[in-house]
Amino acid sequence: MITKQQGEVDNVSLYETDFVKWAEEQAALLTERRFDLLDLENLIEEVDDLAGRHRDALQSHLRVIMIHMLKLVYSTGSRNPEHAWKRSIRNARKAIRRLIDNYPSLSAYLEPLSERAYKYATEDAHDELSDYGDDHESFPTSCPWTLDELVHHEFWPR
């Protein structure tokens, strides 16, 4: 029989050496309701990280939409792949809808994440436009589109 202290030591070392096996064992312990043997410290950290990963994914999709919308509006080059930018926007919009459908509480993060995403999007759009020979110096200081416009499947910037 595994003692509580032995289980704690095994859990911690397993967490560091074989995460998948650690996770499977934690799930089994939860299923068996053997809560006293759980690696609570790492389990709490992992559960918290799960929520963070979904927020990060949401911000990343918003950033992609903003980058390509900025490029659609500000690109003056004749070599720009507008169709690819639009496809990327459509894919990111679908991904956001799936995230919100699966995790409705994420919708509360759209506004604050969009503000942060815009900062990174302007930096990335500037770099990417330079790759196409567009030397655009600056973008609006705040996002020129509403959240509804960013995620609506029929909206395209002009």
PLM feature segments, named:
Residues 1-158:
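Surface/interface-facing alpha-helical segments and adjacent flexible terminal/loop regions used
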